[in-house]
Amino acid sequence: MNALFIIIFMIVVGAIIGGITNVIAIRMLFHPFKPYYIFKFRVPFTPGLIPKRREEIATKIGQVIEEHLLTETLINEKLKSEQSQQAIESMIQQQLQKLTKDQLSIKQITSQIDIDLEQVLQTNGNQYIESQLNNYYTKHQNQTIASLLPNQLVTFLNQHVDNATDLLCDRARNYLSSAKGTQDINDMLDTFFNEKGKLIGMLQMFMTKESIADRIQQELIRLTSHPKARTIVTSLITNEYQTFKDKPLNELLDASQFNEIAENLSVYVTTYASKQANKPVVTLMPQFVDYLEGQLSSKLANLIIEKLSIHLSTIMKKVDLRGLIEEQINTFDLDYIEKLIIEIANKELKLIMSLGFILGGIIGFFQGLVAIFV
């Protein structure tokens, strides 16, 4: 009976010692949070293991995640997966549908990313257009007009310059035959008669003003169809056209004139662009919106994935995943880290404590046997 009591007593004592030892060991992982000193000597095991090795733990966790979990290869594979493709394409489609449904304008779209488009157009737009035009003038001012125009346009003008004669003569004939032309001829005759006085008065004794005006009108109309007159007009137009082509830009427009044109043009362009920017995109560019919804979403998704894949290595270096994780872990309160680890490994920690009681009890049992027989 005495032997049994000794064995039971040793088992209980061993279990208590083993269990409490493991509980203390687990607590010492986290506590104390700071070192304690007696005089100038630091108390052993202060701070606890995790507070003491916190930076090393953060570094190792960051290294493991970067090298084995969130690797560049793994992210690249995930990025190129069909699921990612569909997700990006779906997001683009949603934004395009919102663009159509909400009747968003270009100005509203840019305002969502904190860009005042109207202000940008009025300041940067004017300056940019004027600067580009003035730079163009400075660079090409000594070149001829023909050399500055596109080759196709020069060829077209060369082929059709003779048609200007027909156009001008037809317009002149229509004008002279009209009531306005008749009235203008009569008005000019009145002025002419008033200026010439008595000499013209003698002419009116033989012909009336109306008959003179009618005769002049008929002759002018006849001249518009006369071959020689048309040849003269053609020659004048051709000569003027050739002179115009061969003129340097600075002879046609000096710097001040060109600068004035540049200012007016920049104001016109920016004002027009500002008005268009207030119109809904779906109204302004319906075909483009249809193209976006139909084909571009898939192409844009592929382009995004392709560019991300190409620059993924650079992006990951810029992000510095390891450093980010280290920094984040080092900012956690030790209380939070303790709660987090206990929450994750709660079952395992309880098992360790239970194992301490069991092993302590087993050791106590053998100690009891030794105490009896020795």
UniProtKB/Swiss-Prot annotation:
PANTHER family: UPF0754 MEMBRANE PROTEIN YHEB. Pfam families: DUF445 (PF04286). It comes from Staphylococcus aureus (strain NCTC 8325 / PS 47). This is UPF0754 membrane protein SAOUHSC_01978. It is a multi-pass membrane protein. Its main location: membrane. Keywords: Cell membrane, Membrane, Transmembrane, Transmembrane helix. Belongs to the UPF0754 family. One of its GO terms (cellular component) is plasma membrane. The chain crosses the membrane at residues 4-24, 354-374. It is found in: Cell membrane.
